[in-house]
Amino acid sequence: MESPAFFFTFFLWFLLLSVTGYSVYVSFGPPSKKLRDPFEEHED
């Protein structure tokens, strides 16, 4: 378990989970109030 491939795989999983968690936080958390909705801006 001391091979570089194990640590590289662990790093990639951590990076993937971090990016996914951050995108969910921005989409549905408190920062989502600042996001604009382009479909509501162009009501026809």
From Swiss-Prot:
Name of the protein this chain belongs to: Protein PsbN
Pfam families attached to this UniProt entry: PsbN (PF02468)
Keyword Repeat appears in the UniProt entry: no
Superkingdom of origin organism: Eukaryota
InterPro entries linked to this entry: PSII_PsbN
Example GO BP: photosynthesis
Subcellular compartments: Plastid, Chloroplast thylakoid membrane
Functional description taken from the UniProt entry: May play a role in photosystem I and II biogenesis.
Cellular-component GO terms for this entry: chloroplast thylakoid membrane
Gene name, Swiss-Prot/TrEMBL: psbN
Membrane topology: Single-pass membrane protein
PANTHER family linked to this entry: PROTEIN PSBN
Keywords: Chloroplast, Membrane, Plastid, Thylakoid, Transmembrane, Transmembrane helix
Organism, scientific name: Chlamydomonas reinhardtii
HAMAP family: PSII_PsbN
Family affiliation: Belongs to the PsbN family.
Main location: plastid
Keyword DNA damage attached: no
Sequence intervals crossing the membrane: 6-26
